[in-house]
Each structure stands twice: as C-alpha cells, then as structure tokens.
C-alpha cells in the first residue's frame, strides 16, 4: 500500500474538521495516514517543504493545510474535503 502523509496545523479549523474523516477512513479501510503537524514542528515543516515542487501546483500555488500526499504517486489532495472525496483519493492510490 502507498505511503500517505497528512500535513496539518494544530490550530487549523479545517484540519480539525478533517480529523474525524481521516479517523473514519482508517477505521473502515486499510488506509493509514502518517500525520505531520507543521505549524509548530520544524522537522515536519522541512518534510512538507521537501515536497513543495509537487504540492504547490496541486494546492493553488502555495503550501497549506490540510494537505494529503502520496509519496509514491506524487498525488496530492489539498484543503478541507468531503469524506467521499478523501476516501476516493486514498483508495485509488
């Protein structure tokens, strides 16, 4: 299975609304996300920046949270999305 990352911010309201969707997806499927808080963790910020050339074009030209990233296919899903969209994205990987 592909390695899926979730970049999020501790105080980000969009990230907070996505967490139950992520948890539901992990409970209902074999999908697992490696979660990285980037607002207060410099190592996680560096990790996210290391993918900036791939993430920025897919995320409106900027690095933002929440962002979901597949390290194998280099596909990204950016922002707050409905559960079904997250599920479809994660399972197609």
In which residue ranges do the predicted regions lie?
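Aromatic-flanked redox-active Cys/Sec active sites in thiol-based oxidoreductases
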Residues: 6-12
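Typically the conserved alpha-helix immediately C-terminal to a functionally engaged Cys/Sec
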Residues: 16-30
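Structural micro-motif
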Residues: 52-69
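Generic recognition of short, well-ordered alpha-helical segments
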Residues: 16-20, 46, 81
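Thiol-based oxidoreductase modules, predominantly thioredoxin-like and allied folds used
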Residues: 7, 30-48
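Non-catalytic, surface beta->alpha helical segment in thiol-disulfide oxidoreductase systems
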Residues: 64-93
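Extreme N-terminal starter segment of soluble prokaryotic enzymes
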Residues: 1-5
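Cys/His/Pro-rich metal-binding microdomains
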Residues: 13-16, 69
